[in-house]
Amino acid sequence: MNNPIKLLISGADMGGLIASCALRHDFHESSRQEDRFQIYRIEKDTLTMEDVDACDLSGIRYAVNATLHDNEASFTFDEKCKEQGITVIHAVNLGKAAFLAVEKPKGYPFSEVVKKGTDDFLCSLGKYISQYGMFWQMPVPWIDEAIRHYSNESFPQLGIGAYIAAGYCANILANLAEGKEVKYFPKFYLSPLLEEI
């Protein structure tokens, strides 16, 4: 492939898994899958405003935010990308599950998940998932249980959730690169390890 798609991934551990999956995804028409994306990395789970200011977005087509979303800089990174017309994919490890949201440059802001209050990001996200499920009459009982269980402590960051997120993210990137349809935020992808059918 002559012109690889430039991809920026922020996030250390999960960011590395996403980069690996994106480079080795089955792209059917590409004999050399490594040529599909040219990947740039910010290998930090917690961004600073200095990281965001120093971030060069020249030619970047897609960005993945796999940080912990634990401060304002993470959302400032999203806004900087969106101002440059870059689609942002949010990958979140929920322990034994993964949450992914694709944010259009001029779409509904992902930062709306975090409402003003005392909840940390993952609890706010859990409440968003729960309310979304209730609204569409598709309850997510395991997320309600997790919110109750982890209301006073952090969600566990298990390897299982990171691998699920990385695989889903690679599929979303492939679909975007091939011009296929994806769900845009406020819709999202949610994949628990075990789901009742």
Residue ranges and their predicted role:
Residues 16-17:
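N-terminal Rossmann-fold NAD(P) dinucleotide-binding loop
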Residues 61-160:
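E1/E1-like adenylate-forming module used to activate ubiquitin-like modifiers
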Residues 3, 13, 175-197:
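Phosphate-binding loop/pocket of nucleotide- and phosphate-handling active sites
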Residues 20, 24, 28:
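Gly/Ala-rich phosphate-binding loop of Rossmann-like dinucleotide-binding domains
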Residues 50-58:
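Short amphipathic alpha-helix with an adjacent loop that forms part of the alpha/beta core around
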Residues 28-40:
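Glycine-rich phosphate-binding loop and adjoining beta1-alpha1-beta2 segment
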Residues 107, 165-182:
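Oxidoreductase and adenylate-handling cofactor-binding alpha/beta cores
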Residues 7-9:
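Hydrophobic Val/Ile/Leu positions in short beta-strands of Rossmann-like dinucleotide-binding domains
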